[in-house]
């Protein structure tokens, strides 16, 4: 077995490959944030070279790197997650180094978890996520009553919000923007800072069309694994990246990756001035159920005031783009109109 660690940095990704003794077998590689297709192609080449040598390739990320799993697994790669309790302390900004991830997996394969497309980066930790969300109900409700948390708008108005997470991500973000333009429908995009500067054309297009641009962290981490300082840095750097492109103050609306939260995390977000954006309609489009299934799920779940969660990033989003016209036409036929999250009626 060969092990390829993938780390994220301020500028992109780094890759390091070792054998089952933890010894390097390939030169380290650095890939810019905007070149995820090239990163995927490089990994497929590594896999093929490994197989030619009679070995499989295990690709390893940590729990602060949530942007790659869908695309890499869809491409046929075997992806694993190393958790904080198996790793050394992270640097001030970035994940654990790629070589460390690879060596950790090589020396003790039992410490890493094989990821599944159905549960993504949180494979094996979904129960933990759900327990933390349940524990946060009182804190979430307190923020909602203070106007600092929104999962849906008023149930008295047939107005809904389309939202898209994890972009920008060419070509899928562009395809989704094309559909929104065709129907003249506003939306809210929760962008990941690591890719925002790399794909500034899509970000500029969102702003020019009047869509809302909001914060979805820098690297899509599982928030309970972050320190207060790490969380603040993730948000601040993403705000700055968006502001650099669209020429405005960075967003204050924030959606936690996976909806992950604890009472402590929510208090940190409140102290930092963020308004937490959740949702009440989820078609699980990231699991690639098919365009028809995505459309049907959204139409069945939507109520007045609904916030609909979809994805333009994090992998192949052709199904989401294909489903979107049917979603919009179906909701229009049911008497709904559309608003950005910051313009959704709340009373």
Pin down the residues of each PLM region.
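Phosphate- and other anionic-substrate recognition elements at nucleic-acid/protein interfaces
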Residues: 1-128
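Structural motif
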Residues: 61-64, 166, 312
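A short acidic, amphipathic alpha-helical/loop segment
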Residues: 68-71, 175-176, 201-205, 264-268, ...
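Active-site beta->alpha N-cap acidic-glycine motif
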Residues: 135-230, 234, 241, 250
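Catalytic domains of cell-wall/extracellular-matrix polysaccharide-remodeling enzymes
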Residues: 197-198, 219-337, 342-347
């Amino acid at each position: 077995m060969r092990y390829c660690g993938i780390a994220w940095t301020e500028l992109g990704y780094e890759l390091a490959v070792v054998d089952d003794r933890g010894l390097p077998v390939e030169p380290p590689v650095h890939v810019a944030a905007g070149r995820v297709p090239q990163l995927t192609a490089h990994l497929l080449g590594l896999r093929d070279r490994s197989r030619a040598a009679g070995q499989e390739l295990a690709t390893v990320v940590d729990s602060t790197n949530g942007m790659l799993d869908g695309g890499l697994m869809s491409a046929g790669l075997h992806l694993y997650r190393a958790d904080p309790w198996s790793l050394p302390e992270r640097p001030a900004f970035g994940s654990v180094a790629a070589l460390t991830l690879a060596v950790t997996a090589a020396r003790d394969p039992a410490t890493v978890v094989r990821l599944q497309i159905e549960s993504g980066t949180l494979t094996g930790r979904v129960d933990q996520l759900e327990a933390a969300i349940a524990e946060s109900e009182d804190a979430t409700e307190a923020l909602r009553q203070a106007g600092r948390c929104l999962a849906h708008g008023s149930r008295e108005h047939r107005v809904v919000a389309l939202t898209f997470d994890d972009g920008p991500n060419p070509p899928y973000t562009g395809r989704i923007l094309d559909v929104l333009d065709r129907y003249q429908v506003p939306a809210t995009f929760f962008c990941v800072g690591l890719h925002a500067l790399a794909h500034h054309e899509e970000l500029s297009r969102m702003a020019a069309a009047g869509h809302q641009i909001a914060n979805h962290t820098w690297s899509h981490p599982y928030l309970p694994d972050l320190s207060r300082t790490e969380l603040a840095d993730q948000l601040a750097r993403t705000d700055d990246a968006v502001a650099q492109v669209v020429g405005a103050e960075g967003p204050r609306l924030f959606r936690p990756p996976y909806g992950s939260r604890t009472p402590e995390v929510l208090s940190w977000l409140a102290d930092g001035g963020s308004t937490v954006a959740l949702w009440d309609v989820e078609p699980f489009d990231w699991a690639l159920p098919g365009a028809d299934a995505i459309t049907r799920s959204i139409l069945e779940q939507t109520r007045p005031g609904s916030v609909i969660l979809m994805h333009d990033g994090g992998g192949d989003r052709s199904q989401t783009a294909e489903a979107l016209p049917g979603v919009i036409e179906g909701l229009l036929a049911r008497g709904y109109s559309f608003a950005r999250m910051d313009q959704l009626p709340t009373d």
